[in-house]
Every structure is written in C-alpha cells, then in structure tokens.
C-alpha cells in the first residue's frame, strides 16, 4: 500500500462518541533515527504492553463556526502543551479524513502509567487517537478490517513513529526489511503468526526507577542521530538484528533472544552518550537493577532479561513458565 491509499475525501455531518484503549509497546530491535515524514532509518520489532495503555474518548459534532475546533483534555483537565500537540497533529492529517473539516472534536485522554517516564506514552496516546479517527471514518466507508488496521498504524506513525507498532500485537514490526515480505515504512505489521508460542504470552514487568519526565524527548533523540558519528553503523546493525531476531522469534531460542534485546537496549543508550550534545539517560538505580538481573540469571540459569527505553526505567522480560520464581526475585 502507498500513501495515496489512505487519503479519504468522503465526508458527512453527524454526532457521536468513539472510545479506544491502545497499549504502549517496548521495542526489542530499537527505532532510533528517522528520515523526513516519520520514515524510520531502520526496521524495529516490539512487544505490545497490554497492561500499559491510553484510554481516549473522542466526541464529534458538526462544527459551530466556519473553522472547525479541537478541544483536548488530559485526564479531564486542560493541558495546553498537549492540546497544542494534538491540534497540530490533527491539522497535519486532515487530508486523510474528509470528515475533519466539518466537525468539532472533543478529546479526552488518560494513561494508566506515568507520562514521559520512558514508557512509550506517545505510542499509546497517538495510536488511541488514530484508532478513534479511523473508527469515525469507518461509519461512512466500506473498507475492510485489514485496511482499517493499516490506516490506524499509518496515522499513528505520523504522530509518533513508535505508535505505529501499538495497533496490533503481541509482536509487531515496523520498517521495510527483506526479512519480511509484508513490511513497510508507512505502517507496522503484525508478525505474531511467525513467532514461537512462547513469545505470545511473554511477560514484561516495568521497574519504575524514576517516575519523572525523561531527560530528553524522543524527537530530539532521533534528531541527534543525524550527526552522530556512529549512526550509519547503528542502522546497519539494526537491520541485521531484525533479520536475526526473525529467526530467533520463530525458533523460540531464548539465549539468543536475550543477547540481541539486551545489546539493542545498551546500544541506544551508548548512542545518546556519544551524541553532541550528549545525554545520560540512566540513573544509578538503573544500572543497579541491570547488575541484579545479570547476577540472578547467572545464578539461576533462568531466562530473565532486560531492555530499556529512552529513559531511566527497566523493562524485565521473561517467559510465562518462569514467572513464579522470577516474580519472587522482583518483589524482593
């Protein structure tokens, strides 16, 4: 599919309410660096985080004035920073939704996890909003479910690249790669049918090291890759790791899975350390948690591993079959 496939001129005048819960996700092969128009420099693979989600409600009404209006609240309260971002996003995608020019939108979003703390809140929030808009459009179109999923991912990407991976799951790929025939830079695809069953209910526990906002936004982090001296090598490694991870996910080989995902996590943080200006995303307790994971794995031979997002928090990954012992370790 190409961009023109997602342009819709059809419109209508009606009132209604749509609601959507959309999960966050954690990348295994990381997306870090982009071209124009939210096109990734390399493919990425992620697990969806079903228990970390954004709830978004969109009420639409025929516009009251010549210019349509967009009203946004976060958890029921006005938030001018978020409202500006949402307004800019919706205005940037109006050519893909014919109904937008005829309607005022009243949007409320809320997360069940800390915002801007390294859990991908932009992924869940943008994908939830995109899903609501496509659901509104579906009232006047005859597009099938597969097309609607693609469009939801496509629109999500324009708001936040990683959001494209939050539409489906539990295992999702975004970015063109020879390793997957259906892959695209424009939207993410669900690859769960190509992975071993052990990864369908793989566990993720998030250690909140610091609930505050990230040191640097993901957008600025991507921008810094444009002049990072190691960027080209990084993109090459990520492309190779995507192909390698495809085979690992299919075979269910956990030791190799751990090797790639932990390497990817540390590489992203090392890239930020080598950027100009540089940023230290970890906190002392982040490193302490990582050391404890490595020690636990050496002692028990269980498959507890870690990955990181662009923040201080640690995502612990482990198979469901090992939950009982690993949960005791985490709780202590």
Where are the model-predicted features located?
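Gly/Ser-rich oxyanion-binding loop with an adjacent helix/lid
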Residues: 3-4, 95, 99-199
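Short amphipathic alpha-helical segments
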Residues: 78-85, 125, 148, 285, ...
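ATP-binding N-lobe of GHMP and related small-molecule kinases
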Residues: 1-117, 131-145
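Short alpha-helix boundary/capping segments
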Residues: 78-81, 120-124, 230-233
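C-terminal nucleotide
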Residues: 1-27, 33-37, 194-332
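Short beta-strand scaffold segments in enzyme catalytic cores
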Residues: 27-30, 54-58, 163-166, 170-173, ...
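Charged/polar, low-hydrophobicity segments characteristic of intrinsically disordered regions
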Residues: 88-92, 162-174, 240-243, 248
């Amino acid at each position: 599919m190409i961009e023109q496939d997602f342009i819709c001129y059809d419109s209508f005048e009606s009132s209604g309410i749509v609601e959507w819960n959309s999960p966050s996700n954690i990348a295994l092969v990381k997306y870090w660096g982009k071209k124009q128009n939210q096109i990734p420099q390399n493919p990425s693979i992620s697990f969806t985080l079903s228990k970390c989600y954004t709830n978004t409600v969109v009420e639409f009404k025929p516009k009251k004035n010549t210019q349509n209006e967009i009203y946004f609240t976060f958890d029921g309260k006005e938030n001018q920073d978020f409202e500006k971002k949402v307004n800019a996003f919706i205005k940037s995608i109006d050519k893909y939704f014919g109904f937008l020019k005829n309607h005022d939108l009243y949007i409320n979003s809320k997360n069940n996890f800390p915002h801007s703390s390294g859990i991908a809140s932009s992924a869940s929030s943008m994908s939830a909003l995109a899903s609501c808009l496509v659901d509104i459009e579906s009232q006047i179109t005859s597009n099938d479910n597969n097309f609607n999923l693609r469009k939801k991912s496509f629109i999500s990407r324009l708001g936040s690249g990683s959001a494209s991976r939050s539409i489906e799951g539990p295992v999702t790929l975004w970015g063109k790669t020879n390793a997957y025939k259906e892959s695209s830079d424009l939207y993410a695809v669900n690859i769960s049918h190509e992975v071993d069953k052990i990864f369908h209910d793989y566990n993720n526990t998030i250690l909140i090291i610091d609930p505050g906002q990230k040191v640097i936004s993901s957008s600025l982090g991507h921008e810094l890759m444009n002049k990072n001296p190691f960027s080209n090598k990084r993109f090459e490694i990520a492309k190779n790791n995507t192909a390698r991870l495809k085979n690992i996910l299919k075979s269910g080989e956990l030791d190799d899975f751990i090797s790639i995902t932990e390497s990817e996590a540390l590489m992203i943080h090392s890239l930020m350390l080598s950027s100009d200006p540089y940023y230290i995303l970890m906190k002392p307790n982040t490193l302490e948690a990582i050391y404890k994971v490595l020690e636990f794995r050496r002692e028990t031979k269980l498959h507890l591993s870690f990955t990181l997002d662009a923040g201080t928090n640690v995502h612990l990954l482990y198979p469901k079959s090992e939950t009982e012992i690993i949960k005791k370790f985490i709780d202590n």
